[in-house]
Amino acid sequence: VRHRHLSTLALALGIAVLLDVLRVWLPSVITLFGRAAETPAELLGAFALGWFLLALAAPTLVRRAGSGPVGLVAAGVLAAARLALTAQPGGPAQLWLACAGLLAGLVWLAAVAASVPRPAAGLALGLAGNAVGHALLGTEDLVWRGGALGWSLSALLVAAFLAASTVARRRRPAASAGVGDGDAAPHMRTPGRRAWLLCGPALLLASQVALAPALWNAAAGTGSPDFPGLARPGNGVLPGAFAVLLFLATALFRAPLRLARVVWPLALLAGSVLFVTGRLVPAYLLTAAGLGGCLALADSAAADERPAGDVRAGARRGRAAALGMLVFAVATVAYYAAYDLGYPNGWAPVATALLVALVAVGASLRSVPAVPGATSSAPVLPTLVRVAALGGLTALAGLAATLHVPPTNARAATAPAAVRVAAYNIRMGFGLDGRLDLDAVARELHGSDVILLSEVDRGWWLNGGHDTLALLAGRLGMPYVFAPAADPVWGDAVLSRFPARSGQTRRLTAHGAPTGAQALGVTLDLGGRELAVVATHLQPPPGRDPVEQAREVAEFARRYANGRPLVVGGDLNTEPDDPAFAEFTGAGLVDALAPARPLRTSPADDPRTQIDHVFVSPGLTAAEVRAPRTGASDHLPVTLTVTLP
């Protein structure tokens, strides 16, 4: 029994460490190995999938060298890589450290699977624990925080993982006698194989939907009648705590089998469908309940199957774990590559959920009565431990809601004679060195009164699952209005020191562009007078200027302003001599950056193109126009002072 408890603890801690590495590795692929929207998505996907294909050899290594030695060595490499990443090396060092940590983590999973036939409790606690930690940190990982807090907590996590792994290995019972490497009965089932197959899909569904604190936040600020289809500052961690409660309750406590076979798979499928249709709150709640229940279903089946503690059974579980992680990689690449290649991607989360549901139901239907010597069907953890874990993690998730209070709406003041405006494509908060450095972004925007942001990420798992908008708004002390573009958690935003009274969004027609785009209009109260602001990020069709989208934005902006002073800006992906640029000037708008032309903003390390722009309505004048050199993004920000009439 103690061995089971230690193995469960070691697995939970290892999952948390592996998720930390994945939160660095995924964005490193698209910022360091290549650049999203520049490097072919096929090449990025091939590089990412290659590591998971390489890990398919891990079960053979485990079978030949033994799960104990391989598991401990892999755990050591995983822990060392995780700790080294806390130094935030950036550049190639970050990429290859993360790759080494990922591969070690995949080998470690195969080794653990060889000796742990019932992983559901460990997987559930690891997923929930990592999510709660992410929420407590405001979605900014320890790896990116650094400093005394980052190093001390990282060292504590890594030390606990290594200690639990070492002690669990020492107390692990020997493999079952009587069934050797080569004479295992071919008809004998392998306990835990299906449960391990769910490891990878569960990691994805939890990190992308069910247990994603950034997604909780993004969903919390919606629903205002003055801002239809938009999001304001909101704290979604409290309802997120309910998702943690649902997930752990269904994963650690079994419902009646006949009921569970129907309710949990249906809940999981419904949650995935709601996610791809943009209904985020019911999506993550249903996915959390369904995912936990499906893990419990697979675990119950593993408990009832015949014993197979030999080397061959361990290898089968290891292969299942490796295949499950390959599913994780394929589904992740398939979902996010669509934003570069332009195909529908809603099927990816739904297909992943369907796979989990089918495996869980199939496993429960194949369960047989326990036989002498079979693994006990009792829960892996005693009731007191399960209740304590459920209550403790749920309470900590609720505590996170009090630690990260979003900025409140600014008060109206005396009408200013001028406002300081900035427009910045922040590339999800990642700098040229591949590090998430929102402090650097905030430094570039400090002192601005109105900020127009492009490529704002509020929870993409591909980027590590951060709410970059909330983190940046907290640093600047500025409320925001967010408009979805590519999907509900990726788009454009306006931050302002002045109160935002209302807002609108207009989805732009794709015209062949693979990534979604929109135009966000926000009305600001400047103390007795109003300023209309429009933020957008035009997406050019392959090989063409975004003329049609520029025309749509210009028409929307003119109509939205309705005679009020107007500022329009963002990453427009067009040069001053291009037809799309002329759509704005032809609509009567004035190039606010003209006094400083040429003002090249991209790429940030060698600016050659003028694609980030700000336009104003006639009567407004611009001065102090700058594009300061910085590596905080792959674009340079543009800043200017706009004098009001």
PLM features per residue range, with description:
Residues 446, 450, 473-477, 500, ...:
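Sec-exported extracytoplasmic/periplasmic mature domains
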Residues 342, 346-348, 405-408, 433, ...:
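Structured beta-strand-rich core segments of catalytic domains in phosphoester-bond hydrolases
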Residues 5, 20-31, 45-51, 61-71, ...:
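Metal-dependent phosphoester-hydrolase catalytic domains
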Residues 392-471:
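Membrane-interface segments at or immediately adjacent to transmembrane helices
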Residues 434-437, 441, 465-468, 472, ...:
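Stable alpha-helical elements in mature extracytoplasmic
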Residues 429-431, 458-462, 487-489, 541-543, ...:
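Active-site environment of divalent metal-dependent phosphoester hydrolases
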